[in-house]
Structures are given as structure tokens and as C-alpha cells.
Amino acid sequence: MNIVLLHRDLRVHDNPALFHGTSSGSALVVYVYDKSYWQGNGKSDIQFKFAMDCLSEVSDRLRKKNIPLHIFEGNYENLKNWIEMNFSESVVFMNHFTDIGYYKKSTDKFKRFYADLKRLKIYENFGIQTKNFNRDVWSSNWQQIMTKPILPEIKTSSPMVFKNIELNTFENFSSKLTLIKQITESQVGGETRAFELLNTFLKERANGYALKMSSPVEAEFACSRLSPHIAFGSISLKTVYQSLIEAIPNSFFKKDLYSFKKRLHWHCHFIQKLETEPELEFSSMHPMCDKLRGEGDKEIIEKWIKGETGFPFLDACMQFLKKKGWINFRMRAMIMSFASYNLWQPWQKTSPLLAQLFVDYEPGIHICQVQMQSGVTGINLPRIYSVNKQSRDQDPDASWIKSQIPQLNNFSANSIHNAELAETYKEIICDPKASAKKAR
């Protein structure tokens, strides 16, 4: 018996653990639902809803192959005990993930147990080096992994019935999830949607990507929007990369596609950083920076995360992010920079709150970017964004801001950009120039 464990590889197509686990004997496919994980650092309902979208399609696709999807509710220690009680000769198949510390700690012990018994098959993910990290060969290794052949479709199995295994079906499990059904404006998960986005991006939407990605007005449609699909594995990075390489020669916007190609490489570079240095989840790259900003001010942080800073452009970005679960990279950087420099709040307090808003939360990328935008790496020069300048540059007529904050409809663009709205809007939370000067 093979047991295939799903985590953030929620797809049937090009899934190494699923392919090999179902190709070499009877397989029990299990998604591990650990409530404590979903309450962990930066995790949230909007992400869980996306994961369940993906699992719903996985369940449908597997059913057509006569393979039921089961849900195990508990942590990995509980799972180990359950496996040993029911399938003590089984082999565990899983893909490797770089995730929050809670996941790493629980799965490391689980993997050691099955590795010692020689009952573990684990497969690489994202081109991450898990042992003997060597930066000199990292790029060539990554390239080699990304160009490996896409795995063939998994085979249809003989109908399987597992009796008395005390696992929930996905259908029964999902019927209990009433809260996430209220989340309606964020991206929808699943393989079908992932491939649709990939195709429209490569054929149409990437035109102008290199320029449009900076604007919250245009980025919503000009960016690939594949980030949550890559984060939750509803499409493999290898599939995205190979489709991109195939599209470039005949494209009328090669420059834009090459720009996207660089970002696929950076994606894995940042995840590798957290894989190699997991302590970065809570500790600054430069240790002396950890006490730089004190314990933090709850009231200030609350106004920031709620989008109640008094700066219309920043507040509009936060309102958009809370609705959609996504905003473009430059605005993410500005939001974090404002919290760390202008408001002088410790990144350890603001980072998880911001992560919870992102449907595409990828811990390795988020944590590295947060530290860079907070000036605690000891490597990168501090970059302090001017919210007022970004407001003018990205939304000159303030129409996008007004679409997010309708109460500003009767104000001029200039007064909105300058955050000079008297008592009719929220009082500004800080003096932008004085706070930036002090931070420098």
C-alpha cells in the first residue's frame, strides 16, 4: 500500500508524489488538515478557501481515475500513529515544501521516522536544495529541474474501497466549511483556472507586463495572477516555465515574457533562503536589527492593517488587498516600507498580519521581502517609499483611489495625493516627511 500525502501540491497534472505513488501499486491519497497549521504564522481563511477550491478539483479529477481523495484531520504525529495502526507496511509518498516553522518542525520528525524505516519517497519541489546547499551550482540545478519532462497523466486505477480507515471524504469535509463560503471576491483556485490564466497571460495579457506591473490600476489584469496557483501547487512551476519558454520565440512581446522569466527564478531564490535559514521567520538577517524598533504599538499597527492611516492611496491599497487577497509587488513593498519606516513598527508584528491578507502567501518570498523592505538584512540599502509620490505616479487622476474609497469622490486629485482632506477623512497617522527623515 502506498500513501500519497498532499499539502501545497494541489493538482493531478505533473505531481511527482501523486504520479509515482499511484503508479506503483494501490494508493491512498490523503490531504492532511491540521487546524494548528492554518492558525500558524501568516495563515488565514482566504488562503484556506483557495486550497479548498484546488482540492475540490483534485477530488473530481481523481474520482474519474477511480481514486478517492481522503482527509486526515490532525497533525503529523497523529498521522504517523494512524498509519502505523492501519497500514504498518505502507510507503509514504510526498513532495518537499519550504513552509512556516510549524510545518517544518512537525514534518521533519515525521519524515525522519519513515526515512529510518526506508518507507519514504520524497520529491523535489521548486528546485530547492534541501541538503548541502551550494550557491555556485544553484542556478544550473534549477535550470535542470525546470527542463525535466512533464510527467505523464496518472493512470486510471481499479475501483478502490477502503473500509474502516476512519478518514473523511473530501465531500463530507468540505460540507462543514461554511465560513469560507462567504469569501467571494478573491481568486478561485484549481487546475482549470491556473491553465486558463497561464494561457491568457502568455498569449495576450503579458503585453506591456514589464511596465504595467508597477501600477495597481493595471497590474490586476497585466500580471499573470498565477502566484496563488504556484503557492498552492494547482500548477507546477515546471509547467509554467516550459510553457513560457515555448511561447517566447513567436511572441510579439518577448521583453515582457523575459521579465516574467526572471521572476520565476527569483521566486525559488527567495524560498531557498528560508529553506537554508528557517530562523528568518522570526529573526532578522542582521541580528542587531531585532530590537531596533521596540515592541510595537498595537493601535498604530491596527490602523495600518485596517487601511485607516489617513493617506488615501495607502488606505485604498489596503482596501483593495482585503477584498481581493492580492495586490501588485510595488504596492506590497510600499505598504511594508510605510509600516517599518514611517510608522517604525517591528516587522515581526506587522509581517504575519500582512501575510494573512495574501491569498498567494508564500512564506519564503514574503518573509525575505518583508525583511528587505524593513532594512534589517544588513545587505540591501533601505528604500523608503513616498506614499504621496506613489499616489501621483500610479493614479494621477485619483480615479482608482476613489473606486476603493467612494467617500473621496468629491475631492480633487491634488488634495487626495497630498492627503489634505481636513476633517472629512481620517487624520494622517504620521508626518510623511518627518517620519521618513527620522527613519533614515
Question: What is each of the regions a protein language model found here?
Answer:
Residues 75-196, 368-373, 388:
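Beta-rich, aromatic/charged-enriched effector core domains that present basic-aromatic interfaces
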Residues 29, 69-72, 119-122:
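A structural preference for short, hydrophobic beta-strand core positions in alpha/beta folds
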Residues 45, 65, 189, 211-440:
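C-terminal catalytic domain of photolyase/cryptochrome flavoproteins
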Residues 12, 37-38, 100-103, 128-132, ...:
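Short catalytic/ligand-binding loop motif for oxyanion handling, primarily in non-cytosolic enzymes
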Residues 152-254:
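A charged, amphipathic alpha-helical module
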Residues 23-25, 62-66, 112-121, 204:
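Structural alpha-beta junctions
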Residues 21, 92, 135-136, 233, ...:
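Residue-level signal for inorganic ion chemistry
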Residues 1-67, 425, 434-440:
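N-terminal beta-strand-loop-alpha-helix module at the start
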